[in-house]
Amino acid sequence: VAAWGVMTSRANIQRVLHEFYVYFKSLIQTFTDRGLYPYAGPVELRAHGVDNPAEVLIANAVEPTISGPRPHPDYPERDVIIWFAINNNVDQPLASEFNTRLEEFFLSNYQSYAIVRPEWTKSYAFTADGAYGGAWTNTAILTETFPNTWRDGYPANDNWDFAVATLTALDPHRIFSNSHLDKLFPI
């Protein structure tokens, strides 16, 4: 399952969905015209507000540092996140190319009025020819593009790098790690 979140303003929800629909439909048609069917599954959409510590009912609650729906201090109007889960089988022929092109669309299309973040529990950072259906193989997206959405504009004591340093301090021997997390959270 390839998945991304688009954090935007409530006023832009319809725009986000419309632009996705138009592109997704044209992407499928591009492959179909070549007699190829790299996508065989449903699209799951979810929308909700951004993290709000006041709703937690615990004194001194804070926003999770690397949460997808964490609000951005420079863009308070971006108060919702729409999750797009593309329920595709990675073994489907050309699924990695399809997902790569879709991710490229997300990262380029919405940049003027939204922030795109990965859904941590799903696949992201695609390359058209990588292992695992291309997921987690685009080093630039994995180590720069997505982490920067929690770096730029956030204070040094509450950003991506601070979270990585905290995780490293809590697990200095990398007991709770794997090759993917080692790439995502380098020492």
Residue ranges of each PLM-predicted region?
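Conserved glycine-rich FAD pyrophosphate-binding loop
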Residues: 1-187
